[in-house]
Amino acid sequence: MSFKHSVRDSWLAASYAVGVSELYKKLWGRKRGIISYHNVLPLSKLPHFDTYNVDQTVEVFEKQIQFLQKHFRILPIQELGNPKAEGFFITVDDGMANNYSLLAPILDKYDISALFAVCPALVNGQYPHIWRDHLFLLLRQYQHQPIWLPFNHYREPLQVGINGETLNKLTRKLKKNVYEQQVADIYGLLKEICQKNEWSYELSDDEPLRYQFMNWSQIQDLHRRGHSIASHTMTHRVLKFLPDHEKQYELIESKKHLENQLGTSVDTIVYPYGSLAEIDESTIAIAQEAGYQLGLMNIQTHSLSHPMLALPRFAFPPIDTPAHLHAIASGYKFLFR
């Protein structure tokens, strides 16, 4: 941790202890917020290969929920479309198996309803993993041999270390390359990497809770229990890189699939990744044409034309310290960037 962050964290802890952050919350704090989660895992400590920092332990997740209920107000997810509703909403992205077996029971324990965003094509098995997870799993499985990657048009192999941090850095580097090249067919790129390295595209899955998806019966059961289901597109590709007809497939077909499976209307789209690097005005226009009423991002932006289709969210890191959770939820922390 840098000296700057150490000083900031000490100040946040002191502010919480003497009530300064609580005063900020009452006078100027965030009155409404949408919180994003992804995975909740049955571990005492998260592994260092959480490449995208989207995982929580069961224990920490439950403590975060307890904290929110004590200090803030968690609203029923059915109120999400009401702009006057003040409080916090819980959303969960990707539809992984742990969402059903571990995360949802904690929500049920505290009588909380949430929004689960799923990708129908991934539930149906069109692809075995979200591309970013598949990429990491491939690198992890074959890390002890030279690896050919598209950075230099496969001209020279890379020797990857056995350290998980090295794998994380390489995975992020590949993701950066995808963004720089604006790769639309990301799953095709994964198959190309496998062909160049003579790897099997299919992987043995020893972590089903983390890398496998819920099935339709589980998703339908969540809906019956009072949770809401949203589209997370069909395949979790980067929407901004796609031509309009592919965006239409991702947004319109996912909505149709979900409505057929659930027997009800689906009016919320949760954009994968959720920043302006992945979402453009064309995406918003197609979402509106598809009939979505709400669109969730991961940032605050005023540059897109339809505010209700570009609602901001925030996330908690995997911590349970009250001072930091309070500072993030209230917005107090962001005074000290």
Regions found by a protein language model. Give the residues of each.
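Long, hydrophobic, well-ordered secondary-structure blocks that form the structural core
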Residues: 91-134
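CE4/NodB-like, metal-dependent polysaccharide N-deacetylase domain
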Residues: 84, 96, 105-117, 169-201, ...
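C-terminal active-site subregion of NodB/CE4 polysaccharide deacetylases
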Residues: 1-91, 98, 126, 130-138, ...
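Short, well-structured alpha-helical interface segments that form or flank functional binding sites
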Residues: 63, 98, 102, 214-217
